[in-house]
UniProtKB/Swiss-Prot annotation:
GO terms for molecular function: 4 iron, 4 sulfur cluster binding; 4-hydroxy-3-methylbut-2-enyl diphosphate reductase activity; metal ion binding. The gene is ispH. It comes from Helicobacter pylori (strain ATCC 700392 / 26695) (Campylobacter pylori). This is 4-hydroxy-3-methylbut-2-enyl diphosphate reductase. [4Fe-4S] cluster binds at C12, C92, C186. It is an enzyme of class 1 (oxidoreductase). The keyword Manganese does not apply. Belongs to the IspH family. Isopentenyl diphosphate binds at H36, H70, H120, S214, S215, N216, S258. Catalyzes the conversion of 1-hydroxy-2-methyl-2-(E)-butenyl 4-diphosphate (HMBPP) into a mixture of isopentenyl diphosphate (IPP) and dimethylallyl diphosphate (DMAPP). Acts in the terminal step of the DOXP/MEP pathway for isoprenoid precursor biosynthesis. It holds the Pfam family LYTB. Coiled coil: none annotated.
Amino acid sequence: MEIKMAKDYGFCFGVKRAIQIAEKNQNSLIFGSLIHNAKEINRLEKNFNVKIEEDPKKIPKNKSVIIRTHGIPKQDLEYLKNKGVKITDATCPYVIKPQQIVESMSKEGYQIVLFGDINHPEVKGVISYATNQALVVNSLEELQEKKLQRKVALVSQTTKQTPKLLQIASYLVERCTEVRIFNTICNATSYNQKAALDLSKEVDIMIVVGGKTSSNTKQLLSIAKQHCKDSYLVEDENELELAWFKDKKLCGITAGASTPDWIIENVKQKISTI
């Protein structure tokens, strides 16, 4: 099987930084899952004794705590500070940016519209910085059902697709008196998505490697399927199915921002033997 890798794929700056932080802070707790890749989390726990804790009330005083890449709600961060735990913040700088924008714009009286998944930890963290109730929408259709104010500020979950953000921005501009638009989709996400789109037009089958709970990985799969219907998401080489590759000659591979090189290489090696 011939293999072609996407031009851009895999670990982004924020994930690399977070993993380095975890490796340097052995025996710490991580408040929530550091990244959305279970196998890499297991590696960190096994080799560096960093463990996940989801409940801030269960974190002991004076304990070393790492904040996940997606950030956490403002009230949880304040709780940890008041409790006296030692905080190491691994929040991606690209996530901190929309947090700051939401806080600033809501204080100025803008209604916050956030394009994202309301259940995603990044989104939960970002909207916690709003001083008034924020609207969270995952599509233009969802936005069309919402009541809008005259002054609106638009931000996005960092892993969303730019064309869909532009659709929402256009809708708001047509209906609101004043609209502030902030493109908070991170550069690495945009590059990876474009590379996946370009590659999907060339190949017979596309394999997306990454965690099944990872937003950016699921976006890559969605993009790949636009031009390559035989696109599949796998967490590692063990999930590859031989039947997928029947009568296929060229396989494209991309990977989510939380996918380590060692997993990508294992997938690549197995496909090369088919």
